[in-house]
């Protein structure tokens, strides 16, 4: 794990220096909320409350949503009013999430304590254990990271022989069978997210199916998940596909620059209602009942477009989105495996960012903060698909019923 050094106070050998435990008055201010600061934590002067809040937010991979457009004031008196704006403020002033990953002392769940005006040197020294790795082990780890990135590239580039592209497999298939036999869902056609034409309803369905096959291929490539029991693996697949799908389409849309949701087959779903695809017939019905296309542009595509992600950030970020949130009702062993995989791919995402280490952490955290927008889109998309199903606008197949039933439910 890459760890930033956190400065600590050391006693001077000079006779004029204060002895350990001697009270001294500090005039430092917390860069986040303006309260009294203990010293530097994660790269900036921070009070105990903001230090603990930032630490837990990163450790527990928390995502927050602001109900006021991200414009809340973060000050000592109301710093707990909006956690989303508080975390954004932490990142803006330069707090480094990568330093948190190496911190071995976890704060208690509460983060607000009375702050005395005078503090002793002994209370300001944080214990930090850093695992030292030899140059050889670091080199070996870098090789492994490059291999994983190359493997992900190969998955995105993988295609079936062209003679299989038109084959269909009519029949009734449950989710588990489709997961292990993806040919009944879709062939691996080339991914062409170029947004050259407005999508038809057939394009929408074909993209959903092709994205699911890509999702399964990626999920099966994650080494840490190979020992997960079968039932838990199905829960992971059902609960995380929707978030993965939105990340996939949104990163494609940001790169293609289209005014809508970019698909894998050269088409895109326009944000303009008048241009949206409809079902056949005189009174054709559209599938976007919630304005989800426009919301995806505003809340997800535009921030991604400004970030100008590299190909490595896009493909590793997709895995990070799959692993980002806890999966409900899996075994304790699976929870631990998911947490370990999450930490590994968070580090791998930082490895893909060719910036100074402090800026790496800020960029990674900015991507993680987008998860709140992704989950809002998952809500809206679920409503769209369920209503479309009732109106018989689209038919995704029997295999997808379990996926649609569970794509946002917290219980299985």
From Swiss-Prot:
Keyword Transcription regulation applies: yes
GO CC field: nucleus
SMART domains (UniProt xref): HOLI, ZnF_C4
UniProt-recorded Gene Ontology molecular function terms: DNA-binding transcription factor activity; RNA polymerase II cis-regulatory region sequence-specific DNA binding; zinc ion binding
Region entry Disordered, spans: 1-23
GO biological process, one term: regulation of DNA-templated transcription
Bias (Low complexity) ranges: 1-19
Cell inner membrane is among the record's keywords: no
Record-linked Gene3D superfamilies: Erythroid Transcription Factor GATA-1, subunit A, Retinoid X Receptor
UniProt-listed SUPFAM superfamilies: Glucocorticoid receptor-like (DNA-binding domain), Nuclear receptor ligand-binding domain
Alphabetized InterPro entries for the sequence: C.elegans_NHRs, HNF4-like_DBD, NHR-like_dom_sf, Nucl_hrmn_rcpt_lig-bd, Tudor, Znf_hrmn_rcpt, Znf_NHR/GATA
A matching Pfam family: zf-C4
Stated role: Orphan nuclear receptor.
Protein's name according to its UniProt entry: Nuclear hormone receptor family member nhr-61
Phylogenetic classification of the source organism: Eukaryota, Metazoa, Ecdysozoa, Nematoda, Chromadorea
Gene designation: nhr-61
């Amino acid at each position: 794990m890459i760890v930033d050094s956190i400065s600590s106070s050391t006693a001077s050998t000079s006779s004029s220096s204060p002895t350990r435990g001697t009270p001294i008055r500090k005039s430092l201010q917390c860069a986040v909320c303006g309260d009294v600061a203990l010293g530097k934590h994660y790269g900036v002067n921070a009070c105990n409350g903001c230090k603990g809040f930032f630490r837990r937010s990163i450790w527990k991979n928390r995502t927050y949503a602001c109900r006021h457009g991200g414009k809340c004031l973060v000050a000592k008196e109301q710093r707990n009013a909006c956690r989303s704006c508080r975390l954004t403020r932490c990142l803006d002033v330069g707090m480094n999430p990568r330093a948190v990953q190496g911190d071995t002392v976890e704060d208690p769940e509460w983060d607000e304590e009375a702050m005395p005006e005078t503090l002793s040197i002994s209370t300001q020294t944080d214990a930090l254990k850093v695992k030292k790795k030899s140059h050889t082990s670091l080199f070996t780890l870098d090789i492994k990271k490059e291999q994983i990135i190359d493997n992900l590239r190969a998955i995105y580039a993988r295609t079936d022989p062209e003679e299989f592209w038109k084959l269909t497999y009519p029949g009734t298939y449950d989710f588990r069978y489709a997961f292990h036999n993806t040919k009944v869902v879709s062939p691996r056609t080339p991914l062409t997210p170029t947004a050259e034409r407005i999508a038809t309803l057939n394009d929408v369905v074909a993209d959903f199916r092709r994205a699911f096959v890509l999702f399964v291929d990626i999920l099966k490539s994650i080494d840490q998940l190979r020992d997960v029991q079968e039932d838990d693996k199905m829960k992971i697949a059902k609960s995380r596909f929707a978030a993965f799908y939105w990340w996939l389409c949104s990163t494609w849309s940001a790169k293609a620059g289209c005014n809508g949701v970019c698909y894998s087959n050269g088409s895109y779903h326009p944000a303009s209602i008048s241009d949206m695809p409809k079902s056949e017939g005189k009174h054709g019905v559209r599938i976007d009942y919630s304005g989800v296309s426009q919301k995806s542009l505003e809340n997800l595509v535009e921030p991604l477009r400004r970030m100008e992600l590299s190909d490595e950030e896009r493909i590793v970020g997709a895995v990070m989105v799959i692993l980002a949130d806890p999966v409900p009702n899996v075994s304790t062993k699976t929870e631990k495996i998911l947490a370990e995989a999450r930490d590994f791919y968070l580090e791998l995402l930082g490895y893909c960012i060719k910036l100074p280490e402090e800026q790496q952490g800020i960029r990674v955290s900015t991507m993680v903060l987008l998860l709140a927008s992704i989950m809002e889109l998952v809500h809206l998309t679920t409503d769209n698909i369920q209503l479309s199903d009732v109106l018989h606008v689209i038919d995704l197949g029997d295999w997808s019923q379990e996926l649609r039933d569970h794509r946002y439910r917290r219980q299985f």
